[in-house]
């Protein structure tokens, strides 16, 4: 079997029917022409923010990571492993893609430990066992995996989806694409940077050009490139006509290498 490709979905993708239609059409196009197995990894930050607002609960972030108190983890699990995961599964069904909805803990695919007590139920992701996902891929299924994990003590954990995707790609020996709202990393003038190294990223973070959630995204991509020993792509799902080429290794956003 060819090396799988992990596609991490982020941004407002889950909120936009048009975006989901474009993405799944691109997935179908790719799967028709290529043998390479695909694995979808997702978070659902926008969905969680919306739910928090409806329930009048505060959203607190620390260094771009969501603080998850004990009284919110059940709600976040429901939003990510429930609504977000099954929404994506529904789109797969609609496009005749055989898919399976999972979380990080299924088959111990990604191991999760407590990241920082101050962040509450926020987990640190590390590579786990590839057995379950490889079995599904060999049988022709496309796994759709949420960023909810479980510690060995049985605690539910919210994991940053970029970091979860990195651990998943490491588990599977897979390439990784981080799909989001932006067409890659932008310079001070809003222009896309095609190639990015760790040195260049540190420079742009120090200059305040890369900020907030994008710092987490860039660091996740750099961590991924380091641990996987191969470049990682950050790209936008908005350019749907270019997605099959991206899935086939053509850089359309920012390619990050160490």
UniProtKB/Swiss-Prot annotation:
Listed EC numbers: 2.7.2.8
Site (Transition state stabilizer): 8, 217
Catalytic activity: N-acetyl-L-glutamate + ATP = N-acetyl-L-glutamyl 5-phosphate + ADP
GO MF annotation, one: ATP binding
BP term (GO), one: arginine biosynthetic process via ornithine
Signal peptide extent: none
Family the entry assigns: Belongs to the acetylglutamate kinase family. ArgB subfamily.
Function: Catalyzes the ATP-dependent phosphorylation of N-acetyl-L-glutamate.
Protein name: Acetylglutamate kinase
Taxonomic lineage of the native organism: Bacteria, Pseudomonadati, Pseudomonadota, Gammaproteobacteria, Enterobacterales
Gene that this polypeptide is encoded by: argB
């Amino acid at each position: 079997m060819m090396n799988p490709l992990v596609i991490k979905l982020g941004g407002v993708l889950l909120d936009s029917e048009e975006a989901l239609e474009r993405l799944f059409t691109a997935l179908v196009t790719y799967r028709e022409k290529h043998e390479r197995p695909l694995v979808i990894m997702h978070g659902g930050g926008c969905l969680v923010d919306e739910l928090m607002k409806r329930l009048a609960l505060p959203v607190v972030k620390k260094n771009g990571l969501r603080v998850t108190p004990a009284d919110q983890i059940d709600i976040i699990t429901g939003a990510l492993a429930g609504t977000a995961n099954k929404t994506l599964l529904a789109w797969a069904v609609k496009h005749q893609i055989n898919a399976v909805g999972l979380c990080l803990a299924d088959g111990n695919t990604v191991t999760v430990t407590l990241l920082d007590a101050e962040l509450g139920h926020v987990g640190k992701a590390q590579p786990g066992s590839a057995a379950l996902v490889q079995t599904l891929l060999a049988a022709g299924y496309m796994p759709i995996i949420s960023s909810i994990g479980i510690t060995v003590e049985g605690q539910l954990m919210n994991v940053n989806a970029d970091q979860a995707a990195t651990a998943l790609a490491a588990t599977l020996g897979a390439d990784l694409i981080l799909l989001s709202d932006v067409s890659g990393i932008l310079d001070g003038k809003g222009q896309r940077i095609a190639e990015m190294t760790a040195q260049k990223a540190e420079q742009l973070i120090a200059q305040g050009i890369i900020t907030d959630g994008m710092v987490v995204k860039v660091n996740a991509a750099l961590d991924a490139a380091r641990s996987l020993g191969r470049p990682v792509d950050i790209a936008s799902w908005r350019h749907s006509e270019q997605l099959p080429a991206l899935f086939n290794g053509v850089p359309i956003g920012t390619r990050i290498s160490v």
